Amino acid sequence: MIETDILIIGAGPTGLFTVFEAGLLKLKCHIIDGLPQPGGQLTELYPKKPIFDIPGYPSVLAGDLITNLIEQIKQFQPGFTLNETAETIEKLEDGTFIVTSNKGTKHHANSIAIAGGLGSFEPRKPILKDIEFYENDKGVEYFVKDPEKFRDKKVVISGGGDSALDWSIYLSNIASEVTLVHRRNEFRGALDSVEKVQELKSAGKIKLITPGEVVGFKGSEKIESVDIQVNTTLTTVPCDYFIPLFGLTPKLGAIANWGLEIEKNAIKVNNALDYQTNIEGIYAIGDVNTYPGKLKLILCGFHEATLMVQSVYQRINPGKKYVLKYTTVSGIDGFDGTRKEAEKQVVKSIE
């Protein structure tokens, strides 16, 4: 039986940062994740994608952010149960929990922090004849894990959201040709991304086909071209890769059966205080939760994690007041015996 103060379900950025904030309060954490490595979507789906809204980083690659978070929490020695998913939960008489994974690993924790992002996820695939044939290195890619794979290649991207816009912009400097196809003239993405695509189109760096829709493929062993329906005209565009980016289908999995209050595939929480669910001792933070005014941003997940661990501290130490100290003043004592602190000022008289 694995013993811990906080059992975190999900090893994405929010789950990882929870370890740091909990460590400042001397709370131990253990993380369960269904993937074989920490990082969640950032590692599994787009490690090379730049993120622009992390404070202090004008730009940071998703994979690098995870690497930095893992380095940041190393001193607090979190445990990991990877390649396993949380399956069942039992609340004991003392208010603590036993969570058993799909492989039978048991975890005993005072509190549970569900930080599972979108839960388990799979891409929304377009309904096209023979698309399965072209999967598995034959030309159809649902994620961009390694942009270098597309260097000097002809790429057709289909979609109208942020991912389609962002990857069209990014790959325009790598691929020999980028064609962006969307069934509408209007895009549902960040305004600056839409304007950037317009700018790249004017510069001849991106071919834009709207309104248009990919309706078929050609190629005996791998994709050689895609057929695009534009109004009543069928156009054939040569390509090496077709990347349909229509979002992800989220699934909460077994967590949906834990008696939590669910709204539109997200877990309802009390955002007025501590992001606790309808079950005392179970919290939900990051993209997996919902409340009025919710924003699905990594930054917001960090904030939610910070407040959540304060609540867990009070739950474990009822009536004990925690005095907030700035890390620049107090320093950080790791569970591994290390200490980090600011350089001491030297007091010296001037004669």
From Swiss-Prot:
EC number: 1.18.1.2
Key words, A-Z: FAD, Flavoprotein, NADP, Oxidoreductase
GO MF terms held by the record: ferredoxin-NADP+ reductase activity; flavin adenine dinucleotide binding; NADP binding
Oxidoreductase found in the keyword field: yes
One Pfam entry name: Pyr_redox_2
Cofactor: FAD
UniProt binding sites for FAD: T14, D33, Q41, Y46, A86, F121, D287, T328
Cofactor binding note of this UniProt entry: Binds 1 FAD per subunit.
Catalysed reactions listed for this entry: 2 reduced [2Fe-2S]-[ferredoxin] + NADP(+) + H(+) = 2 oxidized [2Fe-2S]-[ferredoxin] + NADPH
HAMAP family linked to this entry: FENR2 (MF_01685)
Quaternary structure note: Homodimer.
Similarity comment text for this entry: Belongs to the ferredoxin--NADP reductase type 2 family.
Name of this chain's protein: Ferredoxin--NADP reductase
Organism name: Flavobacterium psychrophilum (strain ATCC 49511 / DSM 21280 / CIP 103535 / JIP02/86)
